[in-house]
């Protein structure tokens, strides 16, 4: 009989996504047909699915841990922030609407039905579904109409295990306090807890572990030491991508935009021993020794173009090019490189046109139709075949597009400047392709030496072994109401 287990956390960034991925790999290793599920995710880091939709990147990684292709049912509601108070709402892989935060609650009854429909399909197709919550069930002010945590657990009859993060301190209060503010009906669904991100000797927490068991009456499933190889997995949050402080190597600088999207494009480059990656924060100047500057994707191209200028990066980019450096724009970054970005219909925000950086002779017009597709492409300069995906609104054209970055289905894609030092492309995921990454790095005299997908698979296996060694996995996988 098919079962489900939900991992909820005492807060954001306690490690729910990684733990869910590890449990998915463990279940698969034990011969179970297992699938991941997250009712509601908030992220601008999306993956394109085989069925032509988009889901959170964390669920795509969890699908990989299960040996499955990502599917839109694995993350039926995806919120993609566009402003401080508004998000695009993606339902079962397709853009549904854009809504202000205070109006989102009105949509929840309709969204809950979509969530339950997707969950039922997954559960019917698999032995086990590992469900990941969002944020924390302790945010009881949001409990009414909740579809992400206890609201979903109640509606679906799914047992819950609570995860606390000891690295940030106060884990006893995290778990005991969460129970204290929850309703009796919700507490009844919780079957236990686990402690994540422990550094040092776990036996030093034995007394604290027992205190949590005594105060809550919940079963403890284990204390999980810090997993040192977590950085080898695709980043879920832009802040998870850190500067790799190698002393030598090709120095690549990525601008950390305010609405940065699909930032896991940087992960494969960060793994390369011959690359020194700097994630540039607000207020920091582009270093004088940078070889390549990457302007990544953005959920708000015109907004981030203004943000880029506010940091002085537009002037830095011109100085970087005068020093002989190179620039690559990906998706929204590509749009920024042109002469203008026009949004006559107000698709991304207020209607209007903004001047671009003028580093490529192209122009972009935003359109209401969104392109979501996986592609097989050929890198025009090297002739290398590779795989990637498109996830964007807007169309870009102009004289520099006559020198394409790639060829997709026989059609030119992207643009390269006359001197060859500024490039732009809509294609995400290209650096994940080992053949493309090797060809691209070879332009700068760097040898590619990492098989990225193999590294991720090996890290998922190591994560599974890490959890198996410290948790009562048999009891955890047997949890039921």
From Swiss-Prot:
One of its GO terms (biological process) is cobalamin biosynthetic process. InterPro entries: Class_I_gatase-like (IPR029062), CobQ/CobB/MinD/ParA_Nub-bd_dom (IPR002586), CobQ_GATase1 (IPR033949), CobQ_N (IPR047045), CobQ_synth (IPR004459), GATase_3 (IPR011698), P-loop_NTPase (IPR027417). Residues 249-436 form the GATase cobBQ-type domain. One of its GO terms (molecular function) is ABC-type vitamin B12 transporter activity. SUPFAM superfamilies: Class I glutamine amidotransferase-like, P-loop containing nucleoside triphosphate hydrolases. The active site is at residues 331, 428. PANTHER family: COBYRIC ACID SYNTHASE, DETHIOBIOTIN SYNTHETASE. Belongs to the CobB/CobQ family. CobQ subfamily. Catalyzes amidations at positions B, D, E, and G on adenosylcobyrinic A,C-diamide. NH(2) groups are provided by glutamine, and one molecule of ATP is hydrogenolyzed for each amidation. This is Cobyric acid synthase. It comes from Jannaschia sp. (strain CCS1). The lineage of its organism: Bacteria, Pseudomonadati, Pseudomonadota, Alphaproteobacteria, Rhodobacterales.
């Amino acid at each position: 009989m098919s079962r489900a287990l939900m991992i909820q956390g005492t807060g954001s960034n306690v490690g729910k996504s990684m733990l869910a991925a590890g449990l998915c790999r463990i279940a698969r290793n034990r011969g179970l047909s297992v699938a991941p599920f997250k009712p509601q995710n908030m992220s601008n880091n999306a993956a394109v699915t085989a069925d032509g939709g988009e889901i959170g990147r964390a669920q795509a990684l969890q699908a990989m841990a299960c040996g499955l292709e990502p599917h839109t049912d694995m993350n039926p509601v995806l919120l993609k922030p566009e402003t401080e108070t508004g998000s695009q709402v993606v339902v079962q892989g397709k853009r549904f609407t854009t809504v202000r935060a205070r109006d989102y609650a009105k949509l929840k009854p309709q969204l809950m039905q979509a969530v339950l429909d997707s969950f039922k399909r997954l559960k019917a197709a698999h032995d086990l579904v590992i469900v990941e919550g969002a944020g924390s069930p302790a945010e009881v002010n949001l409990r009414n109409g909740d579809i992400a945590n206890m609201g979903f657990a109640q509606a679906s009859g799914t047992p819950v295990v609570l995860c606390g993060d000891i690295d940030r301190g106060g884990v006893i209060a995290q778990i005991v306090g969460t129970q204290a503010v929850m309703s009796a009906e919700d507490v009844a669904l919780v079957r236990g807890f686990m402690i994540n991100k422990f550094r040092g000797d776990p036996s030093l927490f034995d007394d604290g572990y027992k205190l949590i068991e005594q105060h809550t009456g919940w079963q403890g499933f284990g204390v999980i030491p810090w997993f040192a190889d977590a950085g080898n997995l695709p980043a879920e949050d832009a802040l998870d991508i850190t500067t790799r402080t190698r002393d030598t190597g090709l120095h690549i600088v990525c601008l950390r935009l305010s609405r940065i999207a699909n930032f896991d494009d940087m992960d494969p480059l960060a793994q390369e021993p011959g690359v020194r990656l700097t994630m540039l924060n607000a207020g920091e100047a582009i270093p004088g020794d940078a070889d390549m500057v990457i302007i990544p994707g953005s959920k708000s191209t015109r907004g981030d173009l203004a943000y880029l200028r506010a940091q002085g990066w537009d002037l830095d980019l011109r100085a970087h090019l005068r020093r002989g450096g190179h620039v690559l724009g990906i998706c929204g970054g590509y749009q920024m490189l042109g002469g203008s970005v026009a949004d006559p219909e107000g698709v991304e925000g207020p209607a209007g046109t903004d001047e671009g950086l003028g580093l490529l002779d192209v122009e972009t017009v935003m359109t209401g139709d969104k392109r979501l597709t996986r592609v097989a492409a050929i890198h025009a300069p090297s002739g290398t075949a590779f795989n990637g995906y498109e996830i964007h609104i807007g169309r870009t054209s102009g004289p520099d597009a006559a020198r394409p970055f790639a060829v997709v289905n026989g059609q030119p894609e992207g643009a390269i400047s006359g001197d060859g030092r500024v490039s732009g492309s809509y294609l995400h995921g290209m650096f994940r392709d080992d053949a493309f990454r090797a060809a691209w790095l070879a332009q700068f005299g760097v040898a590619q030496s990492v098989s990225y997908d193999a590294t991720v698979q090996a890290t998922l296996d190591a994560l599974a072994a890490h959890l198996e060694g410290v948790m009562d996995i048999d009891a955890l996988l047997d949890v039921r109401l």
